[in-house]
Design a protein with these regions (language model features):
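Glycine-rich, charge-decorated loop segments at or immediately adjacent to ligand/cofactor-binding or catalytic sites
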Residues: 37-41, 112-134
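Glycine-rich oxoanion-binding loops at beta->alpha junctions
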Residues: 41, 45-76, 88
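Glycine/threonine-rich flexible loop motifs
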Residues: 85-97
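A short helix->loop->beta-strand "cap" motif at the edges of active sites that frequently abuts
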Residues: 23, 106-110
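Conserved anion/nucleotide-ligand pocket segment
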Residues: 133-204
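Short internal beta-strands
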Residues: 24-33, 114
Length: 234
């Protein structure tokens, strides 16, 4: 499972790196925003083939599929998870990872999580999710701003019994602590193009439960808001 943020040095994507070094990459599972990270939030993305490598891309966000088919699970031995999260309960990448972990537990497949820093990992804030409201934008009883990395979520979910126990290995980030400032070298999704957007997203995004637009699709997402019936400005 990977995205454009899954780059080894900010320029080389993991799939390109593994493929170039002779690893047998049998498939790519793509989450929300698609393999190249260009699809908008909630947009359904069809399965396809990566033009650069010829590797099949199996979409987990096509409107029908939330977990891979049995055939897809039989096509590999080890699942490598490399997705750049931003530390929000409603940011869906960790949910895709948990679903894949459950599928791997059922199929006897190993999971390797290549951990990455959390750009919002220096603090925790917001209410803990009441699990009667569990959904595709909230899957664990954690705060809105949870402060965890993907690897920490994976380990905690297994340890707390929130996810099925699987053969899990987390490759940690060298020299990273939660006090380490971190700015993303690559945008993890179309509407988080800047560090400012990443910082504003946890609080401002909550207003998307209303009819107000928060600037998605502009060059200042989450920095502006508007509605056709609004007059003047603040």
């Amino acid at each position: 499972v990977r995205l454009p943020g899954a780059a080894s040095d900010g320029t080389i994507h993991l799939v390109d790196l593994l493929h170039g070094r002779g690893f047998d990459v049998t498939g790519i599972f793509s989450p929300e925003h698609g393999f190249r990270g260009t699809a908008d939030a909630g947009e359904h993305v069809a399965s396809s083939v990566d033009a650069a490598t010829g590797i099949p891309i199996r979409s987990l966000y096509d409107g029908n599929t939330k977990r891979p088919s049995d055939e897809a699970m039989r096509s590999f031995d080890v699942l490598v998870v490399d997705m750049q999260d931003v530390g929000l309960r409603f940011y869906t990448y960790y949910i895709t990872m948990l679903r894949m972990m459950d599928a791997c537990a059922e199929s006897g497949r190993s999971v390797i999580v290549l951990d990455r820093p959390n750009p919002n990992g220096h603090h925790v804030d917001g209410p803990v999710l009441d699990m009667k409201y569990k959904s595709g934008v909230g899957a664990l009883p954690i705060p809105v701003l949870h402060g965890l990395t993907m690897g920490e979520i994976a380990r905690m979910a297994v340890g707390e019994g929130w996810a099925a126990s699987c053969d899990l290995q987390v490759v940690r980030c060298r020299n990273y602590t939660h006090d380490t400032p971190y700015e993303l070298p690559v945008a993890p999704s179309p509407n988080l193009p800047t560090q400012r957007a990443v910082y504003l997203y946890p609080s401002v995004c909550l207003f998307e439960g209303t009819v107000v637009s928060l600037g998605r699709g502009t060059d200042k997402p989450f920095e502006v808001y508007g509605h056709p019936d609004m007059t003047g400005c603040l």
